Amino acid sequence: MKAQELRTKSVEELNAELVNLLGEQFKLRMQAATGQLQQTHQLKQVRRSIAQIKTVLTEKAGE
């Protein structure tokens, strides 16, 4: 998801998406640790999405 799309969402929607992504990151980490993760690029994508959401939440908090 692009940062511009994230900026149009409300804080509640962003927090819900953040919780969802943190759960997804946990699942991917467990799969990687057990050697079951085939598409390792997903870890990077989820980590980046989490960072983008946190950045937008910080921007909204400053407004």
Curated annotation (Swiss-Prot):
Listed PANTHER family: 60S RIBOSOMAL PROTEIN L35/50S RIBOSOMAL PROTEIN L29 (PTHR10916), LARGE RIBOSOMAL SUBUNIT PROTEIN UL29C (PTHR10916:SF0)
Metal-binding among keywords: no
Gene that this polypeptide is encoded by: rpmC
Family, as annotated: Belongs to the universal ribosomal protein uL29 family.
GO function term, MF aspect, one: structural constituent of ribosome
Tree of life domain: Bacteria
Keywords: Ribonucleoprotein, Ribosomal protein
One GO term (biological process): translation
Classification via PROSITE patterns: RIBOSOMAL_L29
Record's protein name: Large ribosomal subunit protein uL29
Protein source organism: Aggregatibacter actinomycetemcomitans (Actinobacillus actinomycetemcomitans)
Gene Ontology CC: cytosolic large ribosomal subunit
Name of one Pfam family that matches: Ribosomal_L29
